[in-house]
UniProtKB/Swiss-Prot annotation:
UniProt-annotated binding residues for Zn(2+): D114, N152, H246, H281
Superkingdom in the source lineage: Eukaryota
Protein's UniProt name: Purple acid phosphatase 3
This protein's UniProt keywords: Glycoprotein, Hydrolase, Iron, Metal-binding, Repeat, Secreted, Signal, Zinc
Pfam families per record: Metallophos
Gene field: PAP3
Compartment list: Secreted
């Protein structure tokens, strides 16, 4: 079956399907949750409208709202490179995510891309969505929004299917757009579509076929994205700024640094005093600092298949803080006073932790 997608706006013509879609998704919400946290309904309705109108062909940065806890803090997990129907320890990582997520009382989960292997989703009806997502991440603590970006493997499938808000009829946790912003009060999270930056996917795709619908003309798409990101970062009034993309900027892993992102994206992050850049792509867990900026580079790409050994060869050893070539995930806890990151292995053991106080961030910025 072939699906035809058009840029969607909430108009009179689209009101009826939107209302049907909203009622379906709303019926899956926990009434107990809404009873105790009625403000969540406001956020839910607003976000649903934005998501429903988001799968356009532009690089426009849509904004979603994510409430913090009553104490003002925000906690979330980060996982990348995972969708393999539970194989390569994906199910075991999911189990530990559920346990850590409960301990931390997380507000949401972030996926750094390569959500469905090997070649994304084939359609809205691809069973891979439920086999690799819904039926794997079943813990109560993981029944929260999953804010997701696309990876290069996702671009080998039907991109519009994975971006479609209609997937929320199957699992209302799923939130996937090309590039977007989540405003979580004390922290702003900027999700960036990094795959179109990488030249080799266009010049030397080998046997792979990429779905570039909505991206071409490429240069216009990238210019618009970089411009909007720069403006959004500059205008952010949040205490903390975190940027999420699939591809590495700095990495000691198999893929190493992404030259195109070093050239085009990194200067914008440096100029706007971003605190973290979080990515997947390399199937490992790692933390790299920076000698010339405030940015910390965190890789969380150990959601399933990992690449063992032989990859650590970073050209700036003084920046290398942590590298682990196995499966796992990371957590982030944000408060007014500090930003805290923890890496976990497939057994839930803490491998590495790092924190920065807001005073330190101000000192470096000055």
């Amino acid at each position: 079956m072939t699906y035809i997608y058009r840029d969607t706006k909430i108009t009179t013509k689209s009101t009826i399907p939107f209302l049907i879609f909203f009622l379906f998704c709303f019926s899956n919400l926990s009434m107990a949750t809404l009873k105790h946290k009625p403000v969540n309904l406001v956020f839910y309705v607003y976000n649903l409208i934005i998501i429903f109108s988001s799968h356009s062909s532009t690089a426009e940065l849509r904004r979603l709202l994510q409430p913090s806890k009553t104490d003002g803090t925000v906690s979330f997990l980060v996982i990348g490179d995972w969708g393999r129907r539970g194989s390569y320890n994906q199910s075991q990582v999911a189990l530990q995510m559920g346990e850590i997520g409960e301990k931390l009382d997380i507000d949401f989960v972030i996926s750094t891309g390569d959500n469905f292997y090997d070649n994304g989703l084939t359609s809205l009806h691809d069973p891979l969505f439920q086999d690799s997502f819904t039926n794997i991440y079943t813990a109560p603590s993981l029944q929260k929004p999953w804010y997701s970006v696309l990876g290069n493997h996702d671009y080998r499938g039907d991109v519009r299917a994975q971006l479609s808000p209609m997937l929320r009829a199957l699992d209302n946790r799923w939130v996937c757009m090309r590039s977007f912003i989540v405003n979580a009060e004390i922290v702003d999270l900027f999700f960036v579509d990094t795959t179109p930056f990488v030249d080799k996917y266009f010049i030397q795709p080998n046997k792979h076929v990429y779905d570039w619908s909505g991206v071409l003309p490429r240069q216009t798409y990238l210019n618009n994205l970089l411009k909007e990101l720069d403006v959004a970062l500059r205008e952010s009034v949040a205490k903390w700024k975190i940027v999420i993309g699939h591809h590495t900027i700095k990495s000691a892993g198999h893929h190493g640094n992404t030259i195109e992102l070093e050239k085009h994206l990194l200067p914008i992050l440096q100029a706007n005093e971003v605190d973290l850049y979080v990515n997947g792509h390399d199937h490992c867990l790692e933390h790299i600092s920076s000698v010339d900026s405030n940015i910390q580079f965190m890789t969380s790409g150990g959601g399933s298949k990992a690449w063992k050994g032989g990859d650590v060869n970073y050209v700036e050893p003084e920046e290398m803080r942590f590298y682990y070539d196995g499966q796992g995930f990371m957590s982030v806890h944000v408060s007014e006073a500090e930003l805290r990151v923890v890496f976990y292995d497939v057994f839930g053991h803490v491998l590495h932790h790092w924190k920065k106080t807001y005073k330190e961030a101000l000192y470096f910025a000055s």
